[in-house]
């Protein structure tokens, strides 16, 4: 088995709650049990809401709980690396610009549900013409970006659940970059990942 590395990656946009605490505890216990390392990674990708005061409280809470970390990192320190990867993915056509407003996306979601269909993104942005894009930008719209999933099965062997499989066609292309250019959790976490165990179900799906 590879050297075990686990991590607790809170977003400093608020105070810790019971869910955060449980996640930190499970990761710390697993690292302790198998002689691995437990890392604290500050996920400060949300530029507007991240605050140092929340970081300080998170550290104090972990120390009070006795959950001592062996190393610490922060996502914002790696933005240059994330920008490099983003540029490559855009060039490869794996990240694409979308101009829908939140209201338009919500309308699409409700319409799909009303028809008994899964509320996955319809990839309308891939059909936008140069004229469409010029029109949106003239309206003052700024694009957000999605990661284009490739067709086929995504599968792996989970130590708890056994073989897990998802069909990419049944999943929405995830939004990875906000309108203001900041990264959502998905992209930096995948680029930065070097952890061997314990992932949240919603992260994997």
Please give the residue ranges for each predicted region.
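A short, hydrophobic C-terminal helix/tail in secreted or cell-surface proteins
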Residues: 200-205
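N-terminal Rossmann-like or analogous alpha/beta NTP/dinucleotide-binding catalytic cores
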Residues: 1-114, 180-182, 198-199
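Active-site cores that bind ATP or allylic diphosphates and position pyrophosphate for catalysis
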Residues: 96-199
């Amino acid at each position: 088995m590879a050297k075990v590395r686990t991590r607790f990656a809170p977003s400093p946009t608020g105070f810790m709650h019971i869910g955060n605490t449980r996640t930190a505890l499970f990761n710390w216990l697993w690292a302790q049990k198998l002689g691995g390392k437990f890392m604290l990674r500050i996920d400060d990708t949300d530029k507007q809401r991240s605050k140092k005061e929340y970081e300080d409280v998170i550290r104090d809470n972990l120390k009070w709980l006795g959950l001592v970390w062996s190393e610490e990192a922060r996502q914002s320190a790696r933005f240059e690396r994330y920008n490099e990867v983003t540029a490559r993915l855009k060039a490869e056509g794996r990240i694409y610009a979308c101009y829908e407003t939140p209201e338009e996306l919500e309308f699409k979601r409700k319409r799909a549900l009303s028809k008994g269909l899964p509320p996955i993104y319809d990839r309308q942005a891939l059909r936008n013409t140069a004229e469409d894009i010029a029109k949106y930008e003239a309206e003052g719209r700024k694009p957000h970006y999605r990661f284009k999933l490739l067709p086929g099965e995504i599968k792996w062997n989970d130590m708890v659940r056994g073989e897990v499989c998802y069909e990419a066609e049944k999943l929405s292309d995830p939004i990875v970059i906000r309108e203001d250019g900041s990264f959502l959790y998905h992209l930096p976490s995948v680029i930065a990942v070097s952890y061997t165990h314990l992932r949240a179900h919603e992260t994997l799906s």
